[in-house]
A protein has these predicted regions:
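C-terminal binding/interaction regions
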Residues: 2-21, 39, 72-136
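Short beta-strand scaffold segments in enzyme catalytic cores
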Residues: 27-34
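Short, charged/polar surface micro-motifs in flexible loops or helix N-caps
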Residues: 36-39, 47
Length: 136
């Protein structure tokens, strides 16, 4: 299946709308586009114990891995937040994205006004902490 901008927007918007963000009121949705034509959505899920909150990007990626998908299966990650400026992933999400996605995959940021920015995963976090530092 080919995903044009409007299709991606509608799918990530559904994830965004499902956000459980009763504390911050800051909704985020994520959409993974897979090479086989399927997609996976994720949303942020907050908790009264704020450290237990899970971001939309990690929700989508962890679910993809739970289903058996891996780096080579993921073409693009689309991230939507309700802000005037585009919202980049937090540091924890960037680290997970660098670990679980190919560095030449695409990240697309979008807001509700349909402003977008696309980049490669490698552009997101130069000098990230990877397995080469663990001597494994």
């Amino acid at each position: 299946m080919e995903y044009n901008f409007e299709t991606k927007y509608e799918l990530v918007k559904k994830a965004f709308d499902n956000s459980y963000s009763k504390y911050s009121k800051f909704k985020v949705g994520a959409l993974l586009i897979l090479k086989n034509g399927e997609y996976i959505q994720g949303t942020n899920v907050e908790n009264a114990s704020f450290g237990l909150t899970n971001c939309a990007e990690r929700t989508a990626l962890f679910y993809a891995y739970t289903l058996g998908y891996r780096q080579d299966d993921i073409l693009e990650l689309v991230i939507m937040a309700d802000s005037e400026e585009l919202t980049y992933p937090c540091g924890a999400c960037r680290q997970v994205i660098m670990e679980l996605m190919n560095h030449d995959a695409i990240i697309t940021l979008v807001n509700l006004k349909k402003k977008t920015l696309s980049m490669k995963v490698s552009d997101l976090m130069p000098g990230y902490f990877g397995e080469e530092y663990l001597n494994v």
